[in-house]
Amino acid sequence: RCPVCRVPASKFVEQKGEQKLAAVHEYGVYAQTVKNNPDISDEDKKFIFDQLMANFNGECSEVGMYLCMARIAHREGYPEIGLYWEKAAYEEAEHAAKFAELLGEDLEPNMKATTKDNLAWRVDCEFGATQGKFDLAVCAKKNGLDAIHDTVHEMARDEARHGRGLEGLLKR
């Protein structure tokens, strides 16, 4: 008998050998099921791919816009609206992640199905993003654009922190 839910022991099946999960998320489903499938027309393949990409890009845009709207709401004294925008942004980010998972390497050839490969790739990307944002901040400062300089320079520091954090994880 289960001590938590009180279900009788007769309802349980002893698991022997390697356990199999009934359902798992998979990486690169588009490539596995659509891309080279002779039963799907080229027109439908293009439609499916284009829609997966458009949805990924749309979800990513919504994340940025919703977080921007959250910042506006907080500044205007509407913290509950700001918090809702933040929640919605997180859900949109989850949607983007699922589209990225479906698309796999067809979205980004450097993105792989392994954590180690993704860490190595993103370390390089974060270091590059740090430099790119720093260069933009310097240009903005040179032109007296303090708001752009200050914001982007802070982002460059964030990218540097991300790069070091990912690098530390990769070295473990």
Language-model region placement:
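Non-heme di-metal
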Residues: 1-172
